[in-house]
Swiss-Prot record:
It comes from Escherichia coli (strain K12). GO terms for biological process: assembly of large subunit precursor of preribosome; cytoplasmic translation; cytosolic ribosome assembly; positive regulation of ribosome biogenesis; regulation of cell growth; ribosomal large subunit assembly. GO terms for cellular component: cytoplasm; cytosolic large ribosomal subunit. It comes from the Bacteria. This is Large ribosomal subunit protein bL27. Signal peptide: none annotated. Part of the 50S ribosomal subunit. Cross-links to the 23S rRNA. Cross-links to the A and P site tRNAs.
């Protein structure tokens, strides 16, 4: 009789769902007000002109225009702003 003894249990075998973070609209792209530009954890990118910051640090356009990425300030922070077309 070909029998296989039962395998033991394991405490592994789980993984969380991907959160789909990252830049959604790149520099030079046209956006409409309300469009999500970046989904992020913390402030890797900061909100510049015509850009709002949600409570989960999502950056979104407050006006229609083109996305502009810039590095400024003494700490070389990355800012995202919207230039009106």
């Amino acid at each position: 009789m070909a029998h296989k003894k039962a395998g033991g249990s394991t405490r592994n075998g789980r993984d969380s769902e991907a959160k789909r973070l990252g830049v959604k609209r790149f520099g030079g792209e046209s956006v409409l007000a309300g469009s999500i530009i970046v989904r992020q954890r913390g402030t890797k990118f900061h909100a510049g002109a015509n850009v709002g910051c949600g409570r989960d640090h999502t950056l979104f356009a407050k006006a229609d225009g083109k996305v502009k990425f810039e590095v400024k300030g003494p700490k070389n922070r990355k800012f995202i702003s919207i230039e009106a077309e």
